């Protein structure tokens, strides 16, 4: 929301500066020394109108003795800053070594964690799959390594290979009729079954994933998409209510709720959903399309075919293929882009777009 700076010169003059991401009035800047205020001013700032001032702190005062605090309009603390001098003689932290080769790592947990770390922090010289495969060479049923291998291949579209790993992961998790504490493998298998069109199995699997708090919102959103595409709007809304209860910032779920309410004729309820999304995400393309005039929406999208494709696919996944076609036809009428034509051909079943 805001940024601030404080610097002290050799002459004892202290410079303070503040700016904000939007126009703010009634903010208060305070600088204190040993808990006692030595400077205080009420200010107004805006991105194009930053605040800057200076005052005399006196000779011999060091910056580490001063604390700068920014208060909001109601007197609450927004930010506080006290300079810190670092001792350059302090030894540096331990250097990160290149990870050992998978076969040289003593235990499977460490081997798995090295692979997982390199999934998180990309290293072009390390292939995380090598580490997961080494774990599975030692223990073919390892749940965590099988899960990561399944996710890895799902993302790359190799659904059959991914499903094999995920089912192996789930097999050990669910032994003795156990409901797994970690539903990552179950959720990802549900995504694969949905993508393959095996809807009954996808529904069953995704419902199992809703038992886990982490995956409840995501799994319920996927279920809502399935029901929405089937025209089962009441069932979809039931899933969406739970998805939003578990994650109030699941804007995909809130947008889908808005689309379904609109389809059911509840335009007021739909508008409230899109307004809620835009309050936190003012550049959300789906909510803007449902809110702006066609001309204003085109200006926002800037004739970018990939942005139109992403939005159209989102509508398609939400069960609103007619909207997806309308979006793609709109950009196709102004920009010649092969991938747009490919998707139009797929969605409409018309070969003319391939010519």
What are these regions (language model features)?
Residues 116-117, 151, 191, 225, ...:
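Residue-level recognition of tetratricopeptide repeat
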Residues 145, 178-179, 185, 219, ...:
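TPR alpha-solenoid repeat register
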Residues 13-42, 66-69:
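Beta-strand-rich binding/interaction modules
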Residues 90-112, 176-180, 294-307:
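TPR-adjacent "capping" and linker segments in tetratricopeptide-repeat scaffold/adaptor proteins
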Residues 138, 172-178, 212, 246, ...:
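Structural marker of alpha-solenoid helical repeat scaffolds
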Residues 148, 181, 188, 222, ...:
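Canonical tetratricopeptide repeat
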């Amino acid at each position: 929301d805001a940024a601030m700076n404080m610097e002290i010169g050799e002459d004892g003059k202290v410079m303070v500066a503040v700016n904000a991401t939007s126009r703010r009035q009634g903010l208060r800047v305070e600088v204190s020394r040993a808990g006692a205020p030595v400077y205080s001013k009420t200010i107004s700032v805006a991105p194009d109108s930053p605040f800057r001032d200076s005052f005399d702190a006196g000779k011999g005062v060091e910056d580490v003795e001063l604390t700068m605090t920014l208060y909001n309009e109601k007197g609450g603390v927004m930010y506080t800053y006290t300079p810190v001098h670092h001792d350059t003689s302090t030894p540096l932290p331990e250097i990160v070594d290149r990870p050992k080769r998978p076969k040289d790592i003593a235990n499977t947990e460490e081997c798995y964690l090295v692979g997982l770390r390199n999934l998180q922090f990309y290293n072009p010289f390390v292939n995380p799959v090598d580490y997961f495969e080494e774990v599975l060479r030692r223990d073919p049923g390892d749940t965590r390594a099988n899960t990561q291998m399944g996710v890895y291949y799902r993302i790359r579209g190799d659904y059959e290979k991914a499903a094999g790993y995920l089912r192996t992961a789930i097999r050990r998790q669910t032994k003795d009729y156990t409901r797994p504490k970690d539903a990552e493998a179950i959720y990802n298998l549900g995504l694969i079954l949905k993508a393959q069109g095996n809807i009954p199995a996808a529904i069953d699997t995704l419902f199992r994933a809703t038992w886990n708090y982490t995956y409840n919102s995501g799994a319920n959103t996927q279920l809502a998409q399935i029901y929405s595409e089937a025209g089962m709007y009441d069932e979809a809304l039931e899933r969406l209510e739970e998805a939003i209860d578990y994650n109030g910032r699941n804007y995909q779920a809130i947008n889908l709720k808005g689309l379904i309410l609109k389809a059911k004729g509840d335009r007021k309820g739909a508008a409230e959903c899109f307004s809620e999304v835009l309050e936190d995400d003012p550049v959300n393309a789906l909510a803007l399309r449902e809110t702006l005039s066609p001309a204003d929406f085109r200006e926002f999208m800037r004739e970018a075919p990939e942005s139109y494709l992403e939005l159209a696919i989102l509508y398609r996944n939400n069960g609103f293929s007619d909207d997806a076609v309308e979006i793609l036809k709109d950009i196709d009428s102004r920009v010649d882009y092969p991938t747009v034509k490919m998707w139009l051909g797929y969605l409409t079943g018309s070969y003319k777009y391939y010519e």
